[in-house]
Amino acid sequence: MNISQTDAEKLAAGCHGNPFSVLGLHEVAGKLSLRVFLPGAETVEALDPKTGRVIVTLNQTETPGLFEGTAARRKKRFAYHLRITQGAHQWQMDDPYRFGPVIGDIDEYLLGEGSHRRLWSVLGAHVITHEGVAGTHFAVWAPNAQRVSVVGEFNVWDGRRMMMRQRGATGVWEIFVPGIGEGEIYKYEIIAPDGSLLPQKADPVGFGAEHPPRTGSVVRKIDGYAWDDAQWMTRRADVQRIDQPVSIYEVHLGSWRRVPEDGNRPLSYVELADQLVAYVKDMGFTHMEVMPVSEFPFDGSWGYQPIGLFAPTIRHGTLDEFRALVAACHRENIGVILDWVPGHFPEDAHGLGRFDGTALYEHADRKEGFHPDWNTLVYNYGRAEVANYLAANALYWLQEHHVDGLRVDAVASMLYRDYSRKDGEWIPNRDGGRENYEAISFLQKVNTESYGEVPGIMTIAEESTAFPGVSAPVDAGGLGFGFKWNMGWMNDTLQYMQQDPIHRKYHHHEMTFGLHYAFSENFILPLSHDEVVHGKGSLLDKMPGQGDDKFANLRAYYGFMWGHPGKKLLFMGCEFAQGVEWNHDSSLDWHLLDHPQHRGMQNLVRDLNALYRENAALHGLDCAAQGFEWIDENNAEASVLAWLRHGPDGGAPMLVVSNFTPVERSHYRLGVPQAGRWVERLNTNADCYGGTGLGNLGGVQSADIAAAGRPFSIDVVLPPLTTLFFQLDDG
């Protein structure tokens, strides 16, 4: 036997860390020797792949499954197929150990440095042609493993058969498996540093996954999709500027609409591309924000505990079918924002936790590496390879899937080491403080690389604290996000709206306080899924009163929101006043649209979107103080608020007035900066919205009567629980 007993024993035990050094073709004493390890085989022959003739018959060694033979007549390395006999069965296969490495020197250098921005082009499973043979290249990062194998039906899930090659000091293992391709299910089998066999792992850079609860990765081609959205991609940078309208429809794909006649299943990506896109277009939203689609094991996490960061969830279809949904949005000039979750990951055995038997992606110390709120693991942002893995994942969605923006989940939990931790449960930073410097650097890296590599996109932070500079540029010391959710505005205004109108005068500041900081960040006003779950009820539930009063309150609130500075976000179902809180296992209650009040609410949101989109006064200076001017800020007794919105072009301003009491206020005088007819552009009390129709008969003429420090004023009717929009008729 031309192999050491130690090597043979390691092969048989499946713990050889360098199988390519002993398997395949090797020169021994000036001759080419061929070795294969095929447990269960009885005879093995090497054939000429062109002629089918036997090149060499391999002999069984003392080690079961290990065969070797010498090609006495061959002087140069040669291609071959293996013919294997086992009982009555005979088959041919190519030998993975006859192929050279796939990863090149530049990729190897970038991997070793932890700076490969297109990490997904190297790691994962790629269908390729290598050395003239079609197959799939597998590569995975597991630097501390003793051995890594790819396993699947193609090798009867036997980790001894396809042990991988380690690439220098990169910690990456690779192997080219000839003859397998799209749709193949696989996992990685890893032996930890202590010699223990770990649970089989899904591919951290897998592009497809099995239907949960199955946990395998699936080979998917990521190249060659025929995009047809060039027109959108060309103009996207202009559409997504800060001075453009951004009105976002937040959607959970699994519960937007279901198919009751087919087991109440959720819609597929293909069906969503037809039905959802048409609906978002009809409603006038500029963007659709999709709750996380990266593959996740537990439905009840809503996608916020992902494991397959590079795989669109198979619950709705394949990777290319997800791309078709994005393309359908773009054809209708709708931007697509993905919820992205780099803050934590679940402890499921097939996931990233202790991936190679060590704390690889997470911190080893649970004070840093475990999240008490969600019982999940926290990424080690200070490790270059981990930060690169996540930053590359952001680029992957933006580049490979043409996604237009990323909304980063739970940013506050990343920024602070003591987030949801008691004294003694967290480790201070190097300066003794609570800020997580590594997470801050990571977020800056993500934003710098995302905006730098993919111009025209947007990034959005869900950040619930007063951390400074979230949407400030990185070179100015900020985190570099394009926008930040205004959680303070949401909490304050919802608190106000839940008050009985008779008590609102004591809470007036909750509606005005947000303007003290409204321009400190580039804000989005969010009424998200978080406000309609966990016993909070629906938005309609939160409104005081009974019947029509509830709807009137909510209509007035929506008017206030669309008239307020900041981009807009509304969770699905809220646009037609879903009556109960959201349930991820059920469809929205679309039957409610048979009722006039719900249909009226839908009409209102559609018209608010149109008014917002079409008037620069309502969006052009959303994030700039010069776009806002109070007219009536302090009338707490009447619970009335009035303000002007200005556009960047000096056009006609928009006057917004909200009356948050159930009292009609006739002859209410409002100061205005210019004389003329002020047209009533929208009245949330209109008949078509489910209101009484009381209003100002299309508009009012100003009078030369000074009011509120303005030389002119208008005398208006403020219907109960109503928001009005007036605009100067400039001819």
From Swiss-Prot:
InterPro entries: A-amylase/branching_C, Branching_enzy, GlgB, GlgB_N, GlgB_N_E_set_prok, Glyco_hydro_13_cat_dom, Glyco_hydro_13_N, Glyco_hydro_b. Keywords: Carbohydrate metabolism, Glycogen biosynthesis, Glycogen metabolism, Glycosyltransferase, Transferase. GO terms for molecular function: 1,4-alpha-glucan branching enzyme activity; cation binding; hydrolase activity, hydrolyzing O-glycosyl compounds. Its EC number is 2.4.1.18. One of its GO terms (cellular component) is cytosol. SMART domains: Aamy. PANTHER family: 1,4-ALPHA-GLUCAN-BRANCHING ENZYME (PTHR43651:SF3). Monomer. This is 1,4-alpha-glucan branching enzyme GlgB. It comes from Roseobacter denitrificans (strain ATCC 33942 / OCh 114) (Erythrobacter sp. (strain OCh 114)). The lineage of its organism: Bacteria, Pseudomonadati, Pseudomonadota, Alphaproteobacteria, Rhodobacterales. The gene is glgB.
